[in-house]
Curated annotation (Swiss-Prot):
Role: Ion channel inhibitor.
Protein's name according to its UniProt entry: U3-theraphotoxin-Hhn1a 6
Propiece residue ranges: 25-52
Top-level taxon of the source organism: Eukaryota
Key word Phosphoprotein present: no
Lineage: Eukaryota, Metazoa, Ecdysozoa, Arthropoda, Chelicerata
Disulfide partners: C54-C67, C61-C72, C66-C79
Entry's family note: Belongs to the neurotoxin 10 (Hwtx-1) family. 51 (Hntx-8) subfamily. Hntx-8 sub-subfamily.
Entry domain remark: The presence of a 'disulfide through disulfide knot' structurally defines this protein as a knottin.
Species of the source: Cyriopagopus hainanus
SUPFAM superfamilies cross-referenced by the UniProt entry: omega toxin-like
Keywords: Disulfide bond, Ion channel impairing toxin, Knottin, Secreted, Signal, Toxin
Primary site of residence: secreted
Cellular-component GO terms for this entry: extracellular region
Amino acid sequence: MVNMKASMFLTFAGLVLLFVVCYASESEKKEFPKEMLSSIFAVDNDFKQEERDCAGYMRECKEKLCCSGYVCSSRWKWCVLPAPWRR
């Protein structure tokens, strides 16, 4: 029983050591922190705010009309989803 525990411990320790060595050699090839941060905070053109002719959900609708599928709330002056109690 002690032999089995020792062999499991050595196997686990060997796997951890292998992981650490592989990670260290991989992180030397590239600057991991800078690369990771730049990929996280990269701004894609699809996600940039675009100017529209209509106001989207929860946008102010005083000067602009709401986009299709939304109505201008008479109380808050925001574009909201149409609902039976808002008609």
